[in-house]
Amino acid sequence: MFGSNDYFEPRVRNPFGYLLPDTGMRHTNVPRLPWPDLRDSFAAAGWANLTNRRDTVKVGDLTFAFAGVDDPHLGYDRLDEVAGPADGNADVRLGVAHAPYLRVLDQFAEDGYDAVLAGHTHGGQVCVPGVGALTTNCDLEPARAKGLHRHPANSHPGDPASSWLHVSAGIGTSPYARIRVACRPEATLLTLVSQAP
C-alpha cells in the first residue's frame, strides 16, 4: 500500500508546521505522481498489493495472512473492506498501514492480527534527547512514534483485542526539509519467533 508521498509531489512547506496541531489540511493540490505505474511494476514483480485488501502469502511451510489499508493520513483507508476476523488458519497474521492511526490499529487488534506494521511518523522527526518525539503527525501518542510496542498501549501478549505494533522511523525526509533531530533514519529488520508452547 502507498502513503501520501507516493501519490503527491513534495512541495516547500514550513518544516516547523509539523509541530503544530493537525488542521486536517492534506495538501493534495500539488501534482500527482505516477503511482499507478509504480503499482503495476511492483505487481509485475510479485508484489502483494495491500491497498484496502487482504492477501495470503506462503513462505516455505508458513502461511502469512495480511490485511492492509490505503493511507489513513489522507483518509484513503477503507477499514470496512478489510475488517473481520484474521485468517485463523494462517501461521502469522499481519496488519499493514502507512500511518498508525488509532482507528486502524484498533480494528486490526480487534480482528486478531498478531502485529501491525506502520511508518509515517519518521520517528517524530524532531526529538528531544531524553524526552523523545514531540509529535507523530497522526493520533498515535509520541511515546510510540517508533519501535516495537503493544496496542493498546497498556495491553499484554495474550490479551484479547491486542497486538504488537511496530512503527518504523524510516529513512525518508522531504527534499525541502532535510531535518531530523535526535532521530536517525532507520531500516528495520524484524525477526519473528514462535510463541512458547
Identify the function of each model-found stretch.
Residues T51, Y76-V82, C138-L140:
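N-terminal post-signal-peptidase region of extra-cytosolic proteins
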Residues M1-K58:
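Core catalytic region of metal-dependent phosphoesterases/phosphodiesterases
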Residues W47-A48, R54-F66, G88-V92, H151-L165, ...:
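Beta-strand-turn-beta hairpins that frame and shape the catalytic cleft
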Residues G3, N49, F66, H98, ...:
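Divalent metal-coordination and catalytic microenvironments
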Residues S4-Y7, R54-D55, D70-P72, P100-Y101, ...:
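Catalytic metal-binding/acid-base residues of hydrolase active sites
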Residues F16-L19, G68, G84-P85, L134-T136:
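Short, hinge-like loop/turn segments at secondary-structure boundaries
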Residues F66-A97:
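Catalytic-adjacent loop/helix segments of enzymes that bind and process anionic phosphate/sulfate esters
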Residues P100-T188, A196:
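Conserved beta-sheet core of the metallophosphoesterase superfamily
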